[in-house]
Swiss-Prot record:
Gene that this polypeptide is encoded by: pheT
Organism: Photobacterium profundum (strain SS9)
EC number in record: 6.1.1.20
GO cellular component, one term: phenylalanine-tRNA ligase complex
Domain of life assignment: Bacteria
Cofactor binding, per record: Binds 2 magnesium ions per tetramer.
Residue ranges occupied by any FDX-ACB domain in the UniProt entry: 718-811
Main location: cytoplasm
Protein name as annotated: Phenylalanine--tRNA ligase beta subunit
Length: 812
């Protein structure tokens, strides 16, 4: 909405300047896009009259004039404008005047004829008006008057970007109301007296779509002079609001729309057949619009018609066949209320966008129509003359908008604004906004506050938050003190020993893995291949038949993902996933035990393809090394061990190759161990059924078994030398080397700091069915240098324990 500040100040006079006014409007929620002067900077331009006008002796397109500016001497001025003529009242830039662009007027000679000034056009005064010649001022204007003062050009045009909810501000009336509220200033509306009818002519009005048009008013005005020129003050006000002057009738309806906020239309009465009918269009009905384009109407479009044809698209655009022309003498003025829901989107459907549709789409005050009709009639008679008939029309009171009654609680107001505004200020603000306010005094409950009945022009006040917004913006957001919210915060319980899952994810990504996320819903028959003998939870309403069971583990989803990637020529696959498995258990909550699991899978080549590196296929120990890296994050990796699957375990884990798989166990204390996961190569039979291409190794481990870590402790660094002793022991080939290393650590005593397996040998020199394990023993004291007796004692103790538990003997 673009408006003239001087026009606004005719209605309300805030004691602030233009810059402060623009800032105030913006802070109230009506964002100002631009504040621009309505004319350029100029001085020395006066009102003059052409008293002589003749042809230039040496130029066909120039005229020599004498101009009266109310002084003793007439001014000789040469002019080239086509509309320069005898008796014309003009804007004269006298010698010494300065026009926009610092253009100074001096005495000159044009083709030998002296010229003491210049007759100015709109553009030469920096006024944005399309015109072909010089500015024509109203006849009878006082000669010698400053043109800047005459046209009130010490003014600015303020362009406001209105949000969709503030349709009430699409008029000077609405903006004045808003500025008056913000400044506690009175609003002076123009006096609109009812125009007394002088004739009895009326046109019947029938509304067939009362829900779309609850009110329609019409008035006949006869014998008007449609060629009368709009007064300069009206043209200027329209121009400063961004509307071009067309003719007196159109200018008047546009003026009333800008002033009052009520779009209007004028029909040529002689082109109306019978009476006015407000109805929905017939599908395919055609109408030629004022711009000359013929459009085919949709059945959901509201039209104004007579008894034979459509005359206009209601609230959007008029029809050419019923429009006012230079031959028109009798008109029918229209002022109606159209429901926003029946106008919204219709203009866009026809590729139209008009000032009228913009206002009706967002909502027009349903009480304005009668006053707007009288205002338009008043102006039409003043400018064009004519004989006025009484206003007639039709309305459906039941379909007119009803005022909203909204409750505002004191507690809610304070809570949302974060500041307590005095109650008397709240009542004053709502009253100034046009609301009918009642106090609700209920101090014993949280309902104490007010009820407010919204005014007819505010469609957007419907709920409590709307009232709070109004109170806040009128009170002034700048007046609400900055106060940080106070919240009693309690830090989450955090144990430093907790192992974050993100740390494990990052480690696996750093080792070349990609994280996968598979569905928790799986194909039940396929799951039986991986976890036989356990009945999963079957979904009553699955997404599809192959996603009807809750998963019992993560391996099934990862294997399917490997197959998916291998089918897309991925020769190296490394994936991991963390997620829940769902184990039916009667004693658990809802009969279901949910456990967080971590699983991984590798397949294909060990490394990326490279000309200098052999592309070996992955094996069991590649994945075991990655899993050991995860266990090291706990800083307690010695508590974990890998044990070959027993025949019993093989039955429980048919997914794994019987000779290339192990269970993951953790020391549970009191010399007991707990199985927490599995690792191994996928069984060839299962590999075939899944469609895997080549060797695939998987692991799955309970997250609860690795989600804590041993916190580091400061220990003294020994300044005494460390000693290493290597022993080679012969044991049964079936003996687990991990168990033997753990036994060494347990039996080594206080001086043993580490024991590592560094060689395994089977062959010549070792009895069949036996193997030789070479173990490095590290010994050190923090108090003294160890003597041979100390070292020998520890080694002998270890050898004795190995002999007792595993039948081990030192290799010769």
């Amino acid at each position: 909405m673009k408006f003239s500040e001087s026009w606004l100040r005719e209605w309300v006079k805030p004691a602030i300047n233009s810059e402060e006014l623009a800032h105030q409007i913006t802070m109230a929620g009506l964002e100002v896009d631009e504040v621009a002067p309505v004319a350029g900077e100029f001085t020395g331009v006066k009102v003059g009259k052409v008293v002589e006008c003749g042809q230039h002796p040496d130029a066909d397109k120039l005229q020599v004039t004498k101009i009266d500016i109310g002084e003793e001497a007439l001014l000789d001025i040469v002019c080239g404008a086509s509309n320069c003529r005898l008796g014309l009242t003009v804007a004269v830039a006298t010698v010494g005047a300065v026009l926009p662009g610092n253009f100074k007027i001096k005495k000159a000679k044009l083709r030998g004829v002296p010229s003491h000034g210049m007759l100015c056009s709109f553009s030469e005064l920096g006024i944005d008006v399309e015109s072909d010649g010089i500015l024509e001022l109203p006849e009878g204007t006082a000669l010698g008057m400053d043109v800047r003062e005459l046209l009130e050009l010490n003014d600015v045009a303020i362009d406001v970007d209105l949000t969709a909810n503030r349709a009430d501000c699409f008029s000077i009336r609405g903006l004045a109301r808003e500025v008056g509220v913000l400044n506690r200033a009175d609003v002076t509306e123009p006096v609109i007296d009812a125009v007394a009818p002088s004739i009895d002519d009326t046109v019947s009005v029938e509304i067939k779509a009362t829900d779309a048009c609850p009110r329609y008013l019409g008035r006949v005005v006869k014998n008007i002079n449609v060629k009368a020129e709009s007064p300069i003050w009206m043209q200027e006000k329209l121009r400063r609001c961004g509307i071009r002057s067309i003719d007196a009738v159109v200018d008047i309806t546009n003026y009333v729309m800008l002033e009052q906020g009520q779009p209007m239309h004028a029909f040529d009465l002689s082109k109306i057949d019978g009476g006015i009918v407000v109805r929905l269009a017939e599908q395919g009905e055609k109408l030629t619009l004022l711009d000359g384009n013929e459009t085919e109407l949709n059945s959901n479009t509201l039209v104004i018609s007579d008894h034979t044809k459509a005359l206009a698209i209601a609230g959007i655009f008029g029809g050419k066949d019923s429009g006012v022309t230079t031959e028109t003498t009798d008109v029918l003025l229209e002022a109606a209320f159209f429901a926003p829901d029946h106008i919204r989107g219709r203009a866009r459907a026809y590729g139209l966008h008009t000032d009228s549709s913009l206002r009706f789409e967002r909502g027009v005050d349903s009480t304005l129509q009668a006053a707007a009709m009288e205002r338009a009639t008043q102006l039409l008679v003043e400018i064009c003359g004519g004989e006025v008939a009484p206003v007639n029309g039709s309305e459906s009171e039941a379909d007119l908008p009803k005022a909203n009654v909204v409750a505002l609680r004191r507690t809610k107001l304070d809570s949302l604004l974060g500041h307590e505004i005095p109650s008397e200020d709240v009542v004053e603000i709502l009253t100034r906004l046009g609301c009918n306010v009642s106090v609700v005094d209920d101090s014993e409950t949280t309902d104490a506050g007010w009820t407010a009945t919204s005014p007819a022009w505010r469609f957007d006040i419907a709920i409590e938050q709307d009232l709070i917004e109004e109170v806040g913006r009128i009170y002034g957001y700048d007046n609400i003190p900055n106060q940080a919210p106070v919240a009693a915060l309690k830090m989450n319980d955090h144990k430093e020993a907790n192992q974050p899952l993100k740390r494990v994810r990052d480690l696996l990504v750093d080792r070349g893995y990609h994280e996968a996320i598979t569905y928790s819903f799986v194909e039940p028959e396929q799951q039986k291949l991986v976890v036989p003998g356990v009945e999963p939870l079957i979904l009553p309403f699955p997404i599809s038949a192959d996603m009807s069971a809750m998963r019992l583990g993560l391996i099934q989803g990862l294997l399917n993902t490997v197959v998916h990637n291998q089918k897309r020529q991925q020769s190296r696959v490394r994936l991991f996933e963390s997620g829940l498995r769902f184990i039916p258990e009667a004693s658990a909550e809802n009969g279901m035990r949910q456990e967080m699991m971590l699983a991984g899978v590798i397949a294909g080549t060990r490394g990326e393809e490279h000309w200098d590196i052999d592309t070996n296929t992955v094996d069991f120990f590649d994945l075991k090394g990655d899993l050991e890296a995860i266990l090291e994050l706990t800083a307690n990796e010695k508590a974990y061990s890998f044990k070959a699957l027993s025949s019993e375990n093989k039955k429980q884990n048919p997914v794994l190759h019987p000779g290339q798989s192990a269970v993951i166990v953790v020391d549970a204390g009191l010399e007991t161990e707990k199985e927490v996961g599995v690792i191994g190569t996928v069984h060839p039979e299962l590999e075939r059924k899944f469609g895997l291409n080549g060797r695939t190794i998987v692991f799955e481990i309970e997250w609860a078994a690795i989600n804590t870590r041993v916190l580091p402790e400061a220990v003294a660094v020994s300044k005494f030398p460390a000693n290493r002793r290597d022993i080679a022991v012969v044991v049964d080939e079936a003996a687990a080397s991990g168990d033997i290393v753990k036994a060494c650590i347990a039996a080594g005593g206080e001086f043993l700091t580490d024991a590592k397996l560094f060689d395994v040998y089977v062959g010549k020199g070792v009895e069949e069915g036996k193997k030789s394990l070479a173990i490095a023993l590290s010994l050190q004291s923090v108090e003294r240098t160890l003597e041979d007796a100390d070292i020998s004692g520890a080694v002998d103790s270890i050898v004795a324990v190995l002999a007792e538990r595993f039948g081990a003997s030192l290799r010769d």
